Amino acid sequence: MRLAVNIDHIATLRNARGEQEPDPVAAALLAEKCGAAGIVCHLREDRRHINDHDLARLREAVTTKLDLEMAMTPELQQIALKTRPELITLVPEKREELTTEGGFDIVRHYAVLAAYLKPFNAAGIEVSLFIEPEKKAIDLAKQAGADLVELHTGLYALKKEGEAQSKELQRIREAAIHARSLGLKVVAGHGLNYLNIAPFREIEEIEEVSIGHAIIARAVLTGLEEAIREMLRIIK
């Protein structure tokens, strides 16, 4: 299983003081050095952490895979096509939320989704949708032209250990199996941490996990390099 490191909260920490440090690009390079298979950043409409300049610098610096999370807006479509990350991930976005609260509502947006994705398909930029682990959403993602799905693991992360968490893990497993049967690549993310990630090693259909907050929080105490290496030790 591969690890993609989300460096948004490096920028959050920097922006808390309006300074230049810590530098998210430096964090991205260190993550790659430690063995991360990709770097994830979310260019939100309000630019609350990563900004346009960060994105441009990340594109120049990242040599593994740059995954740009973004809302489905015309402005961000143009920015993404100009920047040319290896992958874009469409996510829902609410200005009042602290972090992404759920999967992309593909049923609601399906009528316009395929047309929105076509320029990315034509440009050779892979497309992922951050969705709930549900078969209908996966089917629609495939039909709309997605190459990957990122399964939302937030509900799993919120469950206490026991039957409820096991049930949610099984739902994710079944969704991953279904997605792979359609030829989609599968990623998982949201709320995953050092204590709850281990069971995902048993779901072979999930090729990669995307983790940010847990790693950055651990890095405050142990350093970023050790925080990343510790996560890699758990998932390998």
From Swiss-Prot:
Pathway info = Cofactor biosynthesis; pyridoxine 5'-phosphate biosynthesis; pyridoxine 5'-phosphate from D-erythrose 4-phosphate: step 5/5
Q: GO: which molecular function terms?
A: pyridoxine 5'-phosphate synthase activity
SUPFAM superfamilies per record: Pyridoxine 5'-phosphate synthase
Q: Which terms under GO biological process does the entry name?
A: pyridoxine biosynthetic process
- Where's it found, cell-wise? Cytoplasm
Primary enzyme class: transferase
| Catalytic activity as recorded in UniProt | 3-amino-2-oxopropyl phosphate + 1-deoxy-D-xylulose 5-phosphate = pyridoxine 5'-phosphate + phosphate + 2 H2O + H(+)
The source's superkingdom equals Bacteria
Sites marked Transition state stabilizer:
E150
Q: What is its EC number?
A: 2.6.99.2
Q: Does this UniProt record's set of keywords contain Cytoplasm?
A: yes
Binding, 1-deoxy-D-xylulose 5-phosphate = D8, H9, R44, H49, T99
Q: Which GO terms describe its cellular component?
A: cytosol
Chain residues that bind 3-amino-2-oxopropyl phosphate: N6, R17, G191, G212, H213
State the UniProt keywords alphabetically.
Cytoplasm, Pyridoxine biosynthesis, Transferase
**Cited HAMAP family:** PdxJ (MF_00279)
The record's annotation in NCBIfam families points to:
pdxJ (TIGR00559), PRK05265.1-3 (NF003625), PRK05265.1-5 (NF003627)
Q: What does this protein do?
A: Catalyzes the complicated ring closure reaction between the two acyclic compounds 1-deoxy-D-xylulose-5-phosphate (DXP) and 3-amino-2-oxopropyl phosphate (1-amino-acetone-3-phosphate or AAP) to form pyridoxine 5'-phosphate (PNP) and inorganic phosphate.
- Outline the subunit composition: Homooctamer; tetramer of dimers.
What's the protein name? Pyridoxine 5'-phosphate synthase
What taxonomic ancestry is recorded? Bacteria, Pseudomonadati, Chlorobiota, Chlorobiia, Chlorobiales
